[in-house]
């Protein structure tokens, strides 16, 4: 039950089981602070990811302040915006750990550079947290632009982080070393996407890969950040051999290595399953797969993973949004290309659920699993004290309401908050 205490100059929310009440009249000890904007979500079927049944949630200061099945009348003096979700499913906001926030591409000339996308492209897809990175083009695009774009997305209300480096070695950095970038720049949480088994890579050696992974690991220890090495996997026949050698010949923990695109070839996915059994977290990419192609869709791969008996927390799914999806001929020329879309994450989740997988079993790959790997303690779950990043689905599984940092970005399927240069088209 939500309990209130009303004094002469403050309204206090008392959370049962907590030691300290939460003041709703502004910052502690600052009588001139503006009141906290409060949002009450009523009648939500909460999947946290586990199902919690129908709950009411009070949001404020970017956090979930309270959650419960019973709700008392609110004090008349308290200004609260209310949204009745009418029994809709409420999920943690999706976490996309592989996004080309500055735009990717460039493999077929400068005209093929993908432009960056605005904040509403993410939020209308139910995504509230992104990790930006550089890919093939880490020359014309650099870490300064990447970091500036991350900060711009934050100013627009999205949670945004980034990996330092890119496809190639030596990695481009801001401080001169990847370890320095992770230690001294708050938004940088790992290294990536470093390309292996790909004709576009720098053909890194085992020693070079180990040095990068060690820098990521030590920086993670020093800062409490993710400290992961996010690895782009190409179509090369060597597959994950370098990672297997790294695990066999070093003391580095498997969690440091986070290979992505592992569903691009069926044999590569089998290799990735074996790595997950050793303790690595593997990442599927939600790209389109044509009939007869030697690849698994992200939905197919997730189903196979869940049926394999491998630890359910060691798989994540990302979109590669903003990245170019090229197809090459035998000479390495681009035959055709597409662009990764943020909406592919929610489409994949719905596809898996339609095939009979319970939502609470499918959802962690999009929420709590990436939050755990990236050490984002306040994300990926619906609980009191967590960030107020939430996604309410309509009956068809589309994003009906999206809340990022306690702010409504999508309401009843309509975008309420757009980026500075976004139009309504």
Where are these regions (language model features)?
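Histidine-rich, glycine-flanked metal-binding segment
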Residues: 26, 30-31, 36-39, 46-91, ...
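Metal-associated gating/positioning segment near the N- to mid-region
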Residues: 74-77, 85-148
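Short, positively charged and aromatic/hydrophobic N-terminal segments
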Residues: 3, 10-12, 21-27, 31-32
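Divalent metal-coordination and catalytic microenvironments
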Residues: 44, 62, 87, 98, ...
């Amino acid at each position: 039950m939500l309990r209130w205490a009303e004094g002469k100059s403050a309204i206090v929310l008392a959370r049962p089981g907590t030691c300290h009440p939460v003041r709703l009249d502004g910052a502690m000890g600052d009588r001139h602070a503006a009141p906290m904007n409060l949002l009450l979500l009523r009648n939500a079927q909460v999947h946290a990811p586990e199902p919690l049944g129908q709950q009411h949630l009070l949001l404020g200061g970017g956090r979930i302040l309270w959650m419960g099945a019973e709700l008392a009348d609110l004090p008349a003096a308290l200004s609260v915006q209310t949204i009745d979700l009418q029994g809709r499913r409420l999920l943690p906001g999706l976490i996309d750990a592989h996004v080309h926030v500055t735009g990717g591409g460039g493999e077929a000339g400068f005209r093929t550079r993908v432009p960056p996308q605005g904040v509403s492209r993410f939020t209308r897809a139910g995504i509230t947290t992104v990790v930006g990175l550089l890919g093939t083009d880490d020359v014309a695009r650099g870490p300064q632009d990447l970091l500036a774009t991350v900060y711009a997305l934050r100013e627009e209300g999205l949670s945004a982080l980034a990996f330092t480096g890119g496809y190639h070695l030596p990695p481009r950095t801001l401080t001169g070393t990847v370890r320095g970038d992770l230690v001294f720049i708050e938004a940088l949480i790992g290294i990536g996407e470093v390309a292996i088994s790909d004709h576009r890579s720098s053909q890194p050696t085992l020693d070079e890969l180990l040095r990068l992974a060690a820098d990521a690991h030590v920086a993670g220890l020093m800062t409490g950040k993710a400290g992961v090495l996010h690895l782009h996997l190409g179509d090369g026949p060597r597959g994950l051999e370098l990672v297997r050698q790294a695990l066999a010949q070093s003391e580095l923990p498997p969690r440091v290595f986070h290979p992505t695109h592992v569903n691009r070839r069926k044999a590569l996915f089998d290799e990735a399953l074996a790595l997950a059994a050793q303790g690595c977290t593997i990442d599927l990419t939600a790209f389109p797969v044509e009939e007869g192609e030697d690849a698994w869709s992200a939905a197919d791969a997730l189903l196979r993973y869940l049926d394999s008996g491998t630890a359910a927390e060691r798989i994540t799914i990302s979109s590669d949004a903003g990245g170019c999806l090229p197809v090459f001929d035998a000479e390495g020329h681009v035959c055709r290309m597409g662009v990764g879309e943020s909406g592919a994450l929610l489409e994949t989740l719905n596809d898996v659920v339609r095939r009979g997988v319970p939502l609470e079993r499918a959802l962690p790959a999009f929420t709590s699993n990436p939050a755990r790997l990236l050490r984002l303690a306040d994300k990926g779950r619906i609980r009191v004290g967590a960030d107020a990043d939430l996604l309410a689905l309509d009956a068809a599984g589309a994003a009906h309401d999206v809340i990022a940092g306690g702010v409504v970005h999508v309401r009843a399927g309509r975008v309420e908050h757009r980026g500075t240069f976004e139009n309504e088209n």
